[in-house]
């Protein structure tokens, strides 16, 4: 039967991508349906119980700046918070939170169930309804049809999922969940490039069988960082300690002696695994000169004894896993609660997508998350949010939107995927962003919340908080610029004691704040009242100290903006562009970049090649530029 109600947007899958996608579309006013094979697993953390980290927390805070759920759920479920790279510059600082799986999932579930315009239904999807290269709806396992002209697919590792433990394997989406076989077959019928990737997870340990006296303790930071602009320390649950142990030569010997029983090294697994989160057998093989590897022992929650040993992901047979675990200090008598495993799954070449994450071949069909070749909750959530936004915009007959590389890490993520593609699971790092000094985690709201409000993503409460913070920053910057300290004054003596230099002339408080020896607290209270808000005060200090660098980076962006705004006709015949090598012609024809800037980022495309294309466009009268706030041009809704 056909379900009697029609929807604007249907989202398939209730993981980190799916939840952000359906929430975004619903916040924008679209009648949205979330379909999941099991609503008890909505927002489940399938792998490690943590959110954030280097590069990843930037994505979390950008999701939050656009009204998403991940950061606030982390504050409600986070049982240890730390700032990574705290001694380095603000561009690479990152917040990481250990999360209670149950509390995090409950926070996501509560958000979903209380979101207006959002309906939830428990059924796996087996088929898509496609008419004349346009998606029209989906068919569930029970034959029930739901109709919508926008469908967001966020199937994670479930498409053709195959779980490996040793040389044995069986079908599964993750441990305890069935795979999506029928949907995988259906998608393979579409003119999309598909391949296989793999990821893995470590065995889980019973804390009652671990000798913690032998482990190094790792406490969180105090004062605790807060992940969401809507969050606070009062909502964070009780905090716990994590621990550190190490592999040793005995561990490595066990692994080396059993590599022939590894599905990775025996050729059973075809998919490529994540480079930056390798299995323990991969570490031993690739870094043969190292006699030890760090293992972080992460509690799974406040009400469970289950431990997650971060650093020993493995698909070796269970008897080998037991030897590996018990070879480590403190784990001599450890009991494994769940075995580690690897999972192989389908992913689709992201170069077959537009920057809106809509497929190029099927109108209204959007992909987000691991099926686009990424790894990580944060990468999935960011894509889900953007896919949900663009599905809603399409339903409303509006042009698609995607932030550019100088606006957000989300823009870097999507642009890398669509322009360069990926052969291995893609993980975000700060090093991937050429404008990272502008794309700090501390200013995500200042970069994106105004756009989020324009799109209909931001509620009144978050908007008010944002406006107050922005006003506080502006007023305080003006106060610091207009407040002066005279040489020889009592205030000058306070400053001289800290910088060991005599002030020979008058300085504004802003000038003093730019000095590396002084922080905001040192100068703000010399005259007048300092800001009470930590986030606003931090912003004032960072913008003062890095003003010169920030201005230079902005100049670089302005110079490149001409390329960013120069459109390439969708049907341009690169074979007609004189001077281009055959290799360059093939790459440009395959990628179909929408702007010269995106063409320039394709591997192997030289500045000379870009100049030839630019000259060709000028000669043929094809030179066109984006006129407004450089949105990404996409196929109009239809």
UniProtKB/Swiss-Prot annotation:
Keywords: Cytoplasm, FAD, Flavoprotein, NAD, tRNA processing
Binding site for NAD(+): 273-287
GO terms of molecular function: flavin adenine dinucleotide binding
Residues annotated to bind FAD: 13-18, 125, 180, 370
Domain of life: Bacteria
Swiss-Prot/TrEMBL cofactor(s): FAD
Subcellular location per the Swiss-Prot or TrEMBL entry: Cytoplasm
Matches recorded under InterPro entries: FAD/NAD-bd_sf (IPR036188), GIDA_C_N (IPR049312), MnmG (IPR004416), MnmG-rel (IPR002218), MnmG-rel_CS (IPR020595), MnmG_C (IPR026904), MnmG_C_subdom (IPR047001), MnmG_C_subdom_sf (IPR044920)
GO annotations of cellular component type: cytosol
A GO biological process held by the record: tRNA wobble uridine modification
Function: NAD-binding protein involved in the addition of a carboxymethylaminomethyl (cmnm) group at the wobble position (U34) of certain tRNAs, forming tRNA-cmnm(5)s(2)U34.
Family under the similarity heading: Belongs to the MnmG family.
Subunit structure: Homodimer. Heterotetramer of two MnmE and two MnmG subunits.
Name of the protein this chain belongs to: tRNA uridine 5-carboxymethylaminomethyl modification enzyme MnmG
Gene label: mnmG
């Amino acid at each position: 039967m056909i379900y009697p109600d029609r929807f604007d947007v249907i989202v398939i899958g209730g993981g980190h991508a799916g939840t952000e996608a359906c929430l975004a579309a619903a916040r924008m006013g679209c009648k949205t349906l979330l379909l999941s094979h099991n609503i008890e697993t909505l927002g489940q953390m399938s792998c490690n119980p943590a959110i954030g980290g280097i590069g990843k927390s930037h994505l979390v805070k950008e999701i939050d700046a656009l009204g998403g759920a991940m950061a606030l759920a982390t504050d409600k479920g986070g049982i240890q918070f730390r700032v990574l790279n705290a001694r380095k510059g603000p561009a690479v600082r990152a917040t990481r939170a250990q999360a209670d799986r149950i509390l995090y999932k409950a926070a996501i579930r509560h958000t979903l169930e209380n979101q207006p315009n959002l309906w939830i239904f428990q059924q796996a999807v087996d088929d898509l309804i496609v008419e004349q290269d346009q998606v029209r709806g989906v068919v569930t396992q029970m034959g029930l049809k739901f109709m919508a002209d926008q469908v967001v697919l966020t199937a994670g590792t479930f498409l053709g999922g195959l779980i490996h433990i040793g040389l044995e394997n069986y079908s599964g989406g993750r441990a305890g969940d069935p795979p999506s076989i029928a949907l995988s077959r259906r998608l393979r019928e579409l003119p999309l490039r598909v391949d296989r990737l793999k990821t893995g997870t470590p065995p889980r340990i019973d804390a009652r069988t671990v000798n913690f006296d032998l482990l190094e303790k790792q406490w969180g930071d105090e004062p605790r960082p807060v992940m969401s602009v809507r969050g606070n320390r009062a909502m964070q649950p009780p905090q716990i300690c994590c621990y550190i142990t190490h592999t040793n030569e005995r561990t490595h010997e066990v692994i080396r002696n059993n590599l022939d029983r590894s599905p990775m090294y025996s050729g059973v697994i075809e998919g490529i695994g994540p480079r930056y989160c390798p299995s323990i057998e991969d570490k031993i093989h690739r870094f043969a000169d190292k006699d030890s590897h760090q293992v972080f022992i992460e509690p799974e929650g406040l009400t469970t004894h289950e431990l997650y040993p971060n650093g020993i992901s493995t698909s070796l047979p269970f008897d080998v896993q037991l030897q590996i675990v018990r070879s480590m200090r403190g784990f001599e008598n450890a009991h494994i609660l769940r075995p580690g495993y690897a999972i192989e799954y389908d992913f689709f070449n992201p170069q077959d997508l537009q920057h809106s994450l809509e497929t190029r071949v099927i109108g209204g069909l959007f992909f987000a998350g691991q099926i686009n070749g990424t790894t990580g909750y944060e990468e999935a959530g960011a894509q889900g949010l953007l896919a949900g936004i663009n599905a809603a915009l399409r339903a409303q007959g509006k042009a698609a939107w995607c932030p550019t590389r100088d606006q957000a890490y989300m823009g870097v993520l999507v642009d890398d995927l669509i322009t360069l593609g990926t052969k291995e699971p893609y993980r975000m790092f700060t090093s991937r962003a050429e404008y990272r000094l502008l794309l700090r985690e501390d200013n995500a709201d200042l970069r994106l919340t105004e756009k989020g409000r324009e799109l209909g993503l931001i509620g009144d409460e978050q908007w008010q908080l944002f406006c107050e913070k922005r006003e506080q920053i502006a007023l305080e910057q003006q106060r610091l610029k207009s407040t002066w300290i005279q040489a020889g004054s009592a205030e000058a003596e306070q400053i001289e004691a800290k910088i060991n230099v005599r002030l020979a002339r008058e300085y504004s408080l802003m000038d003093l704040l730019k000095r590396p020896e002084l922080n905001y607290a040192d100068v703000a209270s010399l005259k007048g009242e300092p800001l009470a808000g930590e986030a606003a005060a931090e912003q004032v200090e960072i913008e003062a100290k890095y003003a010169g660098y920030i201005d230079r980076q902005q100049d670089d962006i302005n110079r490149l903006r001409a390329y960013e705004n120069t459109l390439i006709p969708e049907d341009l015949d690169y074979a007609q562009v004189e001077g281009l090598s055959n290799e360059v012609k093939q790459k440009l024809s395959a990628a179909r970049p929408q702007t010269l800037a995106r063409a320039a980022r394709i591997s192997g495309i030289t500045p000379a090649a870009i100049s030839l294309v630019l000259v060709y466009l000028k000669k043929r009268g094809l030179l066109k530029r984006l006129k407004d706030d450089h949105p990404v041009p996409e196929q109009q809704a239809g």
